[in-house]
Every structure is written in structure tokens, then in C-alpha cells.
Amino acid sequence: YDIVVMMDANIISKENCLIELAKYFKNEDVGLVAAVIENSVKDDTDIAKQEQYYIKKESQIKVHEGLLFGATIGAFGACYAIRSKYVKTIPSNFLMEDFYLSLNVLEEDAICMTNPEAIVYEDLPGTLQEEFKRKRRISAGNFQNLKIYIHLLWTKNWRVGLPFFSHKILRWMSPFLILTAIILSCLLLAMEPNSFFYRLVFILMLANLILPLVDIVLKRMNISVNLLRLHRYFISMNIAMFLGFIDWIRGVKTNIWKPTERL
């Protein structure tokens, strides 16, 4: 078959989803078309709202990358259609085959799009712990792909390099940037202990690390503050990305993973 649809088993698609995916392939230059994910919040006691917000913004970025550059950087693995000629053998122990195939489409100078009218529905992860494990696995898979496709930053034209760097690589660098900022703030304060500015920076850095603990305490008291929960979600996902990087450095031994428990 010329077009293959990849879909997760836990996905429910809107009735016209396949038609919306297929219509973009009238353009022979299109190699992949991805759907967007919609979630409903059944239980907002943990990080469901924050994950829903993240997925919504991520979908908007992917849609506009396709419209502006013809280069959606990484289709949602939940549901996408791809020309069969771009489906290649996935390397052993690879964790993010959807991202691998998406970048392969761009490497072949084909267009990668996201159609906002192709909609699928998926339940949100049940807890922060579940999403943490998933993001850690995704992070390790992202670095696997980066090792293979980093050349896209300079060997292809800017339509691929710009969104790849600004959307993905900058995000993957964020744990290291945060860690560097913390270390530098400590060093600067040690060098200039009387500096008001360095004291302020250090206090702000310390507050960023303490706020997630405040959210944990408030949650146990059945108090939910959305901004605090969002901040805890942000810090937790960056820790997960860093640990995923460590997993990649150590070497991924298997691509078998336990499905995420969802609401």
C-alpha cells in the first residue's frame, strides 16, 4: 500500500480522521501527515490539567511548523499516516520510532504536516509518577534520534534546521541550562557574598526548587493551586529529561515498556 496509518491501540479516532489524514497526500511532496490529540480532564487532582495544556500547545506548534515550514518535527505517535516508501527498519532497542520515521521523512526532503482536523482522543496519564516514567523514556529515545539526525541542523535548509533547533533541541537542553544556572548562581554568590543582585538570583533559584515541595504538601491537604502544580510539572519533566539522558548514556538495553496508566 502507498499510505500506511500508524495508530496506538488505546486511541479513539474521530469519524473523519482517516479522510483528513489522507487528503494531504494529494500533494506528491507530502510524506507524512499527523493527527492531533484531544484530551478530556476526568480528574484534575494530579497533573491532568497541566498535561492537557502541554499537549494543546504542542499540537499548535506542530500544526504551524507544518504550515510555515512543511516540517512538523515529530508526529504524535498516537496516530499518523506515512507513505510506505518512507517506512524504514527501526534500529534495535529504539524507544521513539514515530520520531525516527518523522525525521526520516524530512531527511528525504519530503513534507511532514499535522492536520488539526484529523483528531484522535486519548485519556490523560493518571499521576505525575506515571507521566514522569513516560517522559524519561521519551527523553532517552529523543537522544537516540538526535545522535542519528543531528546533521539535519546543517545539512538541510533552514526549513528543517530552524524548527528542529527551536522546538526540540532547545527543550532537550533545558535541564542542563537549569542545572548550569543553579551552579553559577551558587558560585557567583560565593565570590560576591555582599552583592544584592547575586543574593536575589540565588533566592529565586532556591525558590524554584522549593515550590514543588510546597505543592506536594498542599496536595496532601487537598489544596490545588494551578500555577504551583504547573511549576512542579515543569521541574519534574526536566528532571525526567535529565534522567532519560543518563539512561541513553548508559545504553538502552530494551525498547519494551510498560503502558502508561491513564485516567
For each feature predicted by the language model, list its residue ranges:
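Short acidic donor-binding/metal-coordinating loop in glycosyltransferase active sites
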Residues: 1, 9-11, 97
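Short aromatic/hydrophobic "clamp" motif used to bind/position activated sugar donors
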Residues: 4
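Loop-to-transmembrane-helix entry motif
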Residues: 68, 142, 172-176
